[in-house]
């Protein structure tokens, strides 16, 4: 169970919230009024996914542009990936593997500069977060990810 508290000047439109949640395969199951200014929503997230995650499930390679935040990659049934940095990048890999419920499976941190990295993907991985240990500026030219 999650609790999210939002303070707004106006009430949130249940229809608009429902439409936004549909974008990530979530559904509002129930709405309860708990006071003049308090509502409780029951939301089914069993088929949800991370919004705007890069998709490596249907592709063999991703060419990722300059990041504004760590990359989130959606994967399934892969055993290895090769991450290569574009010209001008040297980075300190910080990679986190997550299961379908976003529980951490494994964390890989490298305290040395890399241009290329071949890494095994743990079983049951559904998402991978790829970051630089120190600064996203180290991967400002982007990364290429290939599944093997």
What are these regions (language model features)?
Residues 89-104:
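Short, surface-exposed beta-strand/strand-loop-strand elements in extracellular ectodomains
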């Amino acid at each position: 169970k999650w609790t999210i508290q939002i303070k707004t000047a106006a009430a949130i439109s249940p229809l608009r919230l429902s439409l936004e949640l549909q974008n990530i395969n979530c559904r509002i199951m129930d709405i309860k009024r708990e006071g003049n200014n308090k509502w409780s929503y029951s939301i089914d997230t069993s088929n949800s996914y991370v919004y705007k995650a890069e998709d490596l499930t249907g592709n063999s390679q991703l060419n990722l542009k300059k990041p504004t935040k760590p990359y989130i990659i959606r994967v399934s049934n892969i055993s290895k990936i090769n991450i290569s940095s574009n010209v001008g990048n040297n980075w300190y890999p910080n990679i986190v593997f997550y299961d379908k419920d976003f529980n951490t499976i494994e964390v890989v941190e490298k305290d040395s500069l890399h241009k290329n990295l071949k890494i095994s993907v743990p079983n049951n991985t559904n998402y991978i977060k790829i970051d630089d240990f120190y600064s996203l500026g180290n991967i400002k030219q982007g990364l290429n990810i290939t599944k093997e």
